[in-house]
UniProtKB/Swiss-Prot annotation:
Binds 1 Mo-molybdopterin (Mo-MPT) cofactor per subunit. It is a peripheral membrane protein. It is found in: Mitochondrion outer membrane; Peroxisome. The modification N6-acetyllysine is found at residue 156. Its cofactor is Mo-molybdopterin. Catalyzes the reduction of N-oxygenated molecules, acting as a counterpart of cytochrome P450 and flavin-containing monooxygenases in metabolic cycles. As a component of prodrug-converting system, reduces a multitude of N-hydroxylated prodrugs particularly amidoximes, leading to increased drug bioavailability. May be involved in mitochondrial N(omega)-hydroxy-L-arginine (NOHA) reduction, regulating endogenous nitric oxide levels and biosynthesis. GO terms for cellular component: mitochondrial outer membrane; mitochondrion; peroxisome. The keyword Membrane applies. It comes from Rattus norvegicus. Its EC number is 1.7.-.-. This is Mitochondrial amidoxime reducing component 2. The gene is Mtarc2. One of its GO terms (molecular function) is nitrate reductase activity. Its main location: mitochondrion. The keyword Transit peptide applies.
Length: 338
């Protein structure tokens, strides 16, 4: 290498050494710069999203047994599979026929009269004309695992024993029933199976809820519905997990992502309503008409999504849990926007 080359190298701050040596040094330097840039980019805080308060949590319900009466709670954990209060999770128990097919208040309306009390390691069940029964939350691992069927999809459930099976059978008086419990080690029902044609939906799993981990309705939406009904209905007809006050009627239809407490939620879809909404939660009598017929008169979906909702009216919203945490009654509800 000539003197002119050595001078040029000196200007660049590279020693006059063999070409292979300084090229290696240069490469290492460039690599260090690149890694530093990547590290800086990763270390930069993400652009903070704006929070717009849209309401306040006025009520929280957990429904331990599918279709049975909900338990009102002041505070709850929010897991990726739904609400949890202590050791009790939302819709982790389900009544089934002996062949494993689910039974809900659609088939047995009097299920809505089964009251559940949370008692440390037990659930206490009460129903009209029945002696209370205590159900342990933790079941023996030796209990039989049933292959169950829920809205056409397979899911497992651990048998809760003969005593509670006889209790439900005696109460409903139509056929033999079993009670099963979901275990987090079991495989839940996934988005891909719940909505095989809706590939855009985020991925999540549920145990025995109909569609999603969280069901939310605003108080104002119920008020709006009741202005159209001869016989007023209460929120328990619709079995939400979270009720929101302080917003306009059906404003929840527009909420894509929410922050409540330290829980982040993402909209899945609107809640299509069925005949279950016509079961009176105080009497266990099914009407099969109202409030469903009135909802159909003004809450049908846009024609562009008719393949998803068919002729079901929409009332309430389903959400998935994007960040687990806890929430409580009185928490502000924030809409997260970019």
């Amino acid at each position: 290498m000539g003197s002119s080359s050595s001078t040029a190298l000196a200007r660049l701050g590279l020693p006059g050494q063999p070409r292979s040596t300084w090229l290696g040094v240069a490469a290492l330097g460039l690599a260090a710069v690149a890694l530093g840039t990547v590290a800086w980019r990763r270390a930069r805080p993400r652009r903070r999203r704006q929070l717009q308060q849209v309401g306040t949590v006025s009520k929280v319900w957990i429904y331990p047994i599918k279709s049975c009466k909900g338990v009102s709670v002041c505070e709850t954990e929010c897991t990726d599979m739904g609400l949890r209060c202590g050791k009790v999770r939302d819709r982790f128990w389900m009544v089934v026929k002996e062949d494993g097919h689910m039974i809900t208040a659609r088939q047995e309306p009097r299920l809505v009269l089964v009251t559940i009390t949370l008692e440390n390691n037990y659930l206490m069940l009460e129903a009209p004309g029945m002696e209370p029964i205590v159900l342990p939350i933790k079941l023996p691992s030796s209990n039989k695992i049933h292959d169950c069927r829920l809205f056409g999809l397979d899911i497992k459930g651990r048998d809760c024993g003969d005593e509670v099976a006889r209790w439900f059978t005696s109460y409903l008086k139509t056929q033999a029933y079993r009670l099963v419990q979901f275990d987090t080690k079991m495989k839940g029902r996934t988005t891909k199976k719940l909505y095989p044609s809706e590939s855009y939906l985020q991925n999540y799993e549920v145990a025995y809820p109909d569609c999603s981990p969280i069901h939310l309705i605003s108080e104002a939406s119920l008020v709006d519905l009741n202005t159209r009904l001869q016989k007023k209905v209460k929120m328990e007809y619709f079995r939400p997990n979270i009720v929101v006050s302080g917003c306009e009627a059906f404003e929840e239809d527009t909420w894509d992502e929410l922050l409540i407490g330290d829980v982040e939620m993402k909209r899945v879809l609107s809640c299509p309503r069925c005949v279950l909404t016509t079961v009176d939660p105080d009497t266990g009598i099914i009407d099969r008409k109202e409030p469903l017929e009135t909802l159909k008169s003004y809450r049908l979906c846009d024609p562009s999504v008719k393949s998803l909702y068919q002729s079901s009216p929409l009332f309430g919203m389903y959400f998935s849990v994007e960040k687990i945490g806890s929430l409580r009654v009185g928490d502000p509800v924030y809409r997260m926007v970019d």
